[in-house]
Amino acid sequence: MNKTLKYIVLLAIACFVGKASAQELKSEVFSLLNLDYPGLEKVKALHQEGKDEDAAKALLDYYRARTNVKTPDINLNKVTISKEEQQWADDGLKHTFFVHKGYQPSYNYGEDINWQYWPVKDNELRWQLHRHKWFTPMGKAYRISGDEKYAKEWAHQYIDWIKKNPLVKMDKKEYELLSDGKIKGEIENVRFAWRPLEVSNRLQDQTSQFQLFLPSPSFTPDFLTEFLVNYHKHAIPVSYTH
C-alpha cells in the first residue's frame, strides 16, 4: 500500500511539473507581428486561412533562414565559453542556479523549480535570480557541444518561469510598499520577478539566447510563439519608462 501511494504521489508531481513546462501555441503572436514585413508572406497567408500551427512553423522557418542578423553581445561564428560559464550551465541543468557571487556555492531551487525560494532574506538574491544568468552559458554550451540536453532544459525552464511568474496587476502603493509580511504570493513575487532592472536584463540577454538556441529541435514552433509573446510583454513596461 505504501509503495502504491508513493507511486501515485510521484506520478502526480511529474504531471504537475510537465504541465508547468508544457508548450502552447500562442495565436496572439500574429497580432503582435508586422505580417507585411518582407519574408513573412507565407506566415500571413496561413494565419489568414486559420492555419496557425502551420503559420507558426513557417515563422520558425523564417527566423532560421535569416542570414543578416547581428548579435552584438556574442559572435555566433565563434562561440566561446569560460570554465566558470560551463559550470553555471552544468549546474543549471540540475536547477542549481548561479545568482550572485556573494552567495556561493549556489542554491538549488528544486526539481519542480521554486522561483519564489528565498534562502537568505537578501533582496539582491531574489531579484537577481530572475536575471537568469545561467541561460546564456547554457546556450553557449549547446552551440559548442551540440548536446541537446542544454537546449531542452533551457526551453523547459523558460516556459516554467513564464507559468510561475505571471505579471499580475498591482497598484503603485503595493509595488512601493516596504516588505512587512502583508504583501505575499504573486503580488510579492511581481516586485522581484518584474522589477524594471530585471526585465531590462532579460530583454537584452534573450536576444543572444534566441539566436543560440534557434537551431535546436527543442525550439519548436509552439515555443517560438511563447517566446515572442513573453518578449513583447517584457518590452511594453520598459517602453513606458523611457
PLM features: what roles do these ranges have?
Residues 2, 15, 60-62, 127, ...:
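General helical secondary-structure elements
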Residues 23-94:
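Extreme N-terminal leader/anchor segments
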Residues 1-23:
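Bacterial Sec-dependent N-terminal signal peptides
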Residues 17, 22, 34, 50, ...:
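Short, flexible coil/linker elements and helix-boundary hinge sites characteristic
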Residues 97-116, 128-129:
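Short alpha-helical hairpin
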Residues 8-11, 43, 63, 175-178, ...:
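Extended hydrophobic/Leu-rich segments
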Residues 55-56, 79-81, 90, 108, ...:
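Intrinsically disordered, low-complexity regions enriched in Ser/Pro/Gly/Gln/His and often acidic
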Residues 121-240:
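Aromatic-lined, polymer-binding surfaces characteristic
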